[in-house]
């Protein structure tokens, strides 16, 4: 029973860290990455469709993405979707390919992005702590119902705390990597 609670907490904490990593991977660093365009939805015959389903996105060089649209007739719609996104990108057509040059980030913009990333990291830490609180509440309920002893409860809470510390360190490590990546250019 205690092991189930700990395993559940570990799984949920891992998901919190993964969600944080996925979220910050979409923050533009000046270096080309196909994940930058993950949130782009294209109007494809009247329905909003993710760009990934309509084209392949590859890195041409460190500052340029190349989009190869599967259906040439929607090239203009793909360009429009990228231009109207809040990414500040200006795509250009070159035959069947669309090239998306990424402008260099200014120092001020980098500092703003670092603030955003730090805020996201704090959200990640809060999520991990919420999972800890839920696990501790479940343990206290078992103790109250006399299904586990006080010693078992204390040991399990210590294990959950150790797990929490490990996952918060993972969030901090991902934050440090992203900050370094943002300031490297």
Curated annotation (Swiss-Prot):
GO BP terms: namely: cytoplasmic translational termination
What keywords were assigned to this record? Cytoplasm, Protein biosynthesis
Matching CDD domains: RRF (cd00520)
Indicate yes or no for the key word Membrane: no
For the keyword Cytoplasm, the answer is yes
PANTHER family documented for this protein? MITOCHONDRIAL RIBOSOME RECYCLING FACTOR PSEUDO 1, RIBOSOME RECYCLING FACTOR
Provide the family line: Belongs to the RRF family.
Q: What is this protein called?
A: Ribosome-recycling factor
Q: Which gene encodes it?
A: frr
């Amino acid at each position: 029973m205690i092991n189930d609670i700990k395993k559940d907490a570990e799984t949920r904490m891992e998901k919190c860290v993964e969600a944080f990593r996925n979220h910050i991977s979409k923050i533009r660093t000046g270096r080309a990455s196909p994940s930058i365009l993950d949130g782009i939805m294209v109007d494809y015959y009247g329905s909003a469709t993710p760009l990934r389903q309509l084209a392949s996105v590859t890195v041409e060089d460190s500052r340029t993405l190349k989009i190869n649209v599967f259906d040439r007739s929607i090239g203009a719609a793909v360009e429009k979707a990228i231009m109207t996104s809040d990414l500040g990108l200006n795509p250009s057509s070159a035959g069947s390919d669309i090239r998306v040059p990424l402008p260099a980030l200014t120092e001020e913009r980098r500092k703003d992005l670092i603030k955003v990333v730090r805020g996201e990291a704090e959200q990640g830490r809060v999520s991990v702590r919420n999972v800890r609180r839920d696990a501790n509440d479940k343990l206290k309920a078992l103790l109250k119902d006399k299904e586990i002893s006080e010693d078992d409860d204390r040991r399990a809470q210590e294990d959950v705390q150790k797990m929490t510390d490990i996952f918060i360190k993972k969030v901090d490590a991902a934050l440090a990597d992203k900050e370094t990546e943002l300031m490297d250019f």
